[in-house]
Amino acid sequence: MSKDAGGGQMNSNLKTSLSECMEALDLFLSNNFQEALDQLRAKSKDSMYHALTYATMLEMQAMMTFDPQDILNAGNTMKEAQAVCQRYRRKSTVVDSFNSLVHKQSLDQFTEEEIHAEVCYAECLLQRAALTFLQDENMVSFIKGGIKVRNSYQTYKELHSLQQCANYAKGESHCHFEGGVKLGVGAFNLTISMLPTRILRLLEFVGFSGNKDYGLSQLQEGTTVHSFRALLCTLLLLCYHTFLRFVLGTGSGNIEEAEKLLEPYLKRYPKGAIFLFFAGRIEEIKGNIDEAISRFEECCESQQNWKQFHHMCYWQLMWCFTYKQHWKMAYFYADLLSKENSWSKATYMYMKAAYLSMFAEDDCKPFGDDEVQIFRLVPSLKLKIAGKSLPTEKFAIRKSRRYLAQKLVPLPVPPLEMMYIWNGYAVIGKHQDLTEAMLQTLVRAEKSLEGVTASEFLIDDRCVVKLLKGLCYKYLGRIPEAVESFSYIQLNEKRIKYDHYLVPNAMLELALLYLQLEKKEEALRLLENAKNNYKNYSMESRTHFRIQDALQQAKSLPQNGC
């Protein structure tokens, strides 16, 4: 349909579609999940916005469950949405591509619907790539999306350029288009800026570039535009500040910014499960553990239709009770997850056994469970998503294997070690009482290692405890003891037999401590050493993300003594 012949009708259809999708989004945020999906599904084969919104909601579900079937379903639905968007794109030859049109032909050859089709198509590609990364934390898998990622990136770049053109005429639904461009440009800039240097160089070689501050500003602007994408911009920023900065960073998210973003949504949707969850997470990383527990419990009570929200809360509640060293409650939530959620049975069972190992001798163990038997079960629960094992699961399986030996040597503090993998010490570090209590537990563990018979695991176990003690010392301001703890691991590097991840992570933690003390040169030496001289160790990708974050922090500091 040409612009002159039916532009008015197309604009009317576009406006109606956007209005209906906004209504469905409102239902979704009010916990009416199935009603929202049903409304969208009815038109998902014909309307690009219905198709995209429907697929986005299914992808959100997959991100909550990690269920292989949910992931497959979300991926297929997003692929179908992409095909719907393709039907609305401007028909052109390979040579006469969209990119060529922007630069070489008059912009008025695009109808408003065709412009929206471009941004929706790019968003489908971006979300499919995100789903790939969800399955494997290694950015190589993201890059393997290859043409999907590159086409999406290039399209967003061209659309962004289009907006800046003097002869670009804004359509009636321009705010939704603008929000889509800000979402894509912001997401790409932010994601690329976080990548470890080795991957960043590869991406830059093939034409990608990312600026963290620009990405954040684009997403921030996207939250203020009254558009279909404002929510997605908000959720992405909330995820960045409250999760990515911790799991794939050094734990320095902008919590004040997260609170500002969340406030209007909590006001409008006081029982909205998504927003109650983020409210709980914000309290958690502020160190207000009891308040966080209340919020997560409130989130579970707010709706019963999507158990996936409950599972996200159970995971956070498990950690909240870990921080408080309430082992029975932490076990309770790990047990619930092992029975109800499919993300990683191996990880959940590992955590169950880990908590049981912390029970006092006279504690009654639930259902007569025995941690040794559960640890032995963990390797058999290995799950592959899209042919890949989850990094956390690999870690749990490696740790559990020592329990398969006839003469077993127990792990010293398994839940506290896994807590480090998820950057939990950055959380309790804001709460002196919790940090002191954790340190005392580690001191007792260290003393117990002094009296054991020497084994092949002894040095590794001592170094694990030293790393965790060093973190507690750091957050308590006991700097010399923190330095001694991290340095102990480096001194014993050649004696470590299995836990090779300890050395680069000890260097990373010592470097972060030096950055705190404004010893930039010493910090940079450690970070470069950790980045360049160690490989093939547990949770390597996550460590490299954190090293990259630390290197970016170092750039903002003056030289030593300046």
From Swiss-Prot:
SUPFAM superfamilies, alphabetized: TPR-like
Pfam families with a match to the protein in the record: Iml2-TPR_39, TPR_6
The organism's place on the tree of life at top rank: Eukaryota
InterPro entries referenced in this protein's UniProt entry, alphabetically: Iml2/TPR_39, TPR-like_helical_dom_sf, TPR_rpt
Record protein name field: Tetratricopeptide repeat protein 39A
TPR repeat windows: 273-306, 463-496, 504-537
Family: Belongs to the TTC39 family.
Keywords: Repeat, TPR repeat
